[in-house]
Amino acid sequence: MTLTVTNYPFRDRWNDCLVRRAQYTGPSSYATGGEAIDNIDDFGWGETHTLVGTITDGTTQHHLYLNYATQRIMVFLAAGTQVTNGTNLSTFIGQIVATGK
């Protein structure tokens, strides 16, 4: 996964959870079911609890959804359907906010 994480030491808290803001770049070949989060390497925690964000290529916007059970970032079209398997999202970039422990 391509993430550029921004940390703000000692202020990155939401109740008892850590908060991270990151720039997310979509994969070159999206897999149905989403892109796996490597919690330790991507965010520095054991489990992601929430993730909010959108990605765009400058023309089209997609919504990001965290599948909590599988710890995967899923990408959805504005119509509410998941992006199809094999779709190139490498030109889609956006900001995400995630919480975890």
Predicted features and spans:
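Extracellular receptor-binding modules and their adjoining Ser/Thr/Gly/Asp/Asn-rich linkers
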Residues: 1-35, 92-101
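Extracellular attachment/recognition segments
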Residues: 26-90
